[in-house]
A protein has these predicted regions:
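N-terminal hydrophobic/helix-forming segments and targeting peptides
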Residues: 1-466
Length: 466
């Protein structure tokens, strides 16, 4: 079943809208390089569209009615938005779910050290990365430093033109004969992913008898005190993430693609957010949940396994229909969801791992995966045929370009998403997302046409699904 390349179908007006969506998308990628930054950005955009914090509604004893727009935040790393419909919650919601964490390198809690007059930050990588891809790149440092006095300092170094950047070094080719014989998984080891952050000793009084032994480290500590009013001990309560420095860029002479960090899964997260904020009226309550920790198993308080979403739905049921555990269960069971996560784009350079008839292609629209998992569909959510038919109808109703695919050839590999977690409530769930080249690399590639079709598809799902 061949699908048209969406680029061949657009009018001048649609091409203008496509570029508008992609410009906003690139701006969001630049502003949201961590899960915290994504939540901050989502809250700003939601407030601008009239969304209110559910905590304020509860505190003020207000009731919630059709048309109301609410959001709830969990620990500044996960957010759920709700646009209340005319039908009761017990008839189910139309849910868009994506994750906003991406593979990266994290700074450890006791990280700062000096070695032969180089200052480093000790690190531990997060998520599935090819470690060798992260060396010799300009890197930025993002995150927060929580201090004992209760204040939190925001950190972002390496994104402005006049900012310094950081780097993880690699062995020169002239001395790398043994290194080049290693397997790709071990050619760069995890303990060698430490971040080079300085080499200049602190200025010292030459008349002093006892001089600073680790003068480069001392200089870094001095600079941290100067710029962030932090002590070395404050690393203990810091969350600092190392990400590629630089902005999202148009890719290709024809500017048909986007090259950027973190498009898994922010391409689905931001297009879901755009769709959610653009919807005017809904019958079934619309929900957009953007979660943390998917890349490491959706665990913890801010991952999809958390009770945060269930608890928030319980609060909404209480605010609309009165407290009832049974009504909460009905609201969840009767819901419909798009688990919005990226798909592997067919790459002609690595054609041997793909089965073309079941592959996702650039420019052919939103990708649906009936199932994910590995080997014999292990760990998969396998969507029902009846639900797939409804999905097709919703997409066709708004002329969305879409395709169905799997993740590579059978037995070659596999992957998972948050779909199976939400399916545990008994709701209908299918994986849907955007095809990505170089997935999990520091810089990933998407098609602008697919970004636009994802936005259209997510909006159609909210408006058309019954």
């Amino acid at each position: 079943m061949d699908r048209k390349n969406a680029w061949t179908t657009y009018s001048k007006e649609e091409l203008d809208r496509l570029e508008q969506v992609n410009t906003e998308y690139k701006n969001c990628l630049d502003a949201g390089k961590t899960e915290r930054e994504c939540v901050t950005l989502a809250v700003e955009k939601a407030k601008a569209e009239g969304y209110k914090d559910i905590r304020d509604i509860i505190k003020n004893g207000e009731k919630v009615k059709a048309g109301d727009k609410l959001y709830a935040v969990c620990m500044n790393k996960t957010i759920a938005l709700f646009h209340m419909g005319t039908k009761p919650l017990t008839e189910g919601m139309n849910i868009l779910g994506a994750h906003i964490d991406s593979p990266r390198i994290d700074v450890k809690q006791n990280p700062l050290y000096e070695n032969e007059e180089f200052a480093y930050l000790d690190t531990h990588y997060y998520g599935g990365i090819k470690k060798y891809q992260w060396v010799t790149l300009p890197l930025a440092l993002h995150g927060v430093i929580a201090k004992k006095d209760g204040t939190t300092v925001q950190v972002s170094i390496g994104e402005k033109e006049d900012d310094p950047v950081f780097v993880i070094t690699d062995l020169l080719i002239h001395l790398a004969s043994k290194q080049m014989e290693k397997k790709a998984a071990t050619v760069v080891e995890g303990e060698k992913l430490d971040l080079l952050i300085g080499s200049r000793p602190i200025e010292q009084d030459e008349t002093l008898e006892e001089k600073e032994k680790e003068a480069v480290k001392a200089n870094v500590i001095n600079l941290l005190k100067q710029y962030y009013d932090m002590e070395e001990e404050d690393f203990l309560s810091a969350e600092l993430e190392i990400v590629p420095a630089g902005k999202a860029r148009d890719c290709g002479l024809d500017r048909s693609m986007v090259l950027a960090y973190g498009q898994d899964d922010r391409v689905c997260a931001f297009t879901s957010l755009f769709a959610m904020l653009d919807v005017k009226e809904v019958e079934h309550t619309a929900c957009c949940i953007l979660v943390d920790k998917e890349e490491i198993g959706s665990v913890g308080a801010t991952g999809m396994h958390s009770r945060f979403f269930e608890n928030t739905v319980a609060e909404l049921v209480a605010l609309t229909e009165g407290e009832s555990d049974l009504k909460v269960r009905r609201a969840l069971m009767n819901s419909r969801m798009l688990s919005s996560d990226v798909s592997a784009a067919y790459d002609p350079m690595y054609a041997e791992v793909f089965e073309k008839r079941s592959s996702a292609f650039f420019g052919k629209g939103l990708v649906f995966n009936k199932f994910t998992g590995a080997r014999g569909k292990s760990g998969s959510n396998d969507a029902n045929a009846e639900y797939l038919a409804k999905i097709r109808n919703a997409m066709d109703a708004q002329s969305v370009a879409y395709q169905f695919a799997e993740l590579g050839k059978v037995d070659v590999g596999g992957g998972g998403t948050i779909a199976y977690i939400m399916a545990n409530y008994g709701m209908e769930v299918i994986d849907s997302g955007v095809a990505v080249l170089s997935m999990h690399a520091p810089w990933e590639v998407t098609s602008k046409a697919d970004v636009y079709e994802a936005y259209k598809g997510y909006k159609a799902f909210i408006e058309e699904m019954r």
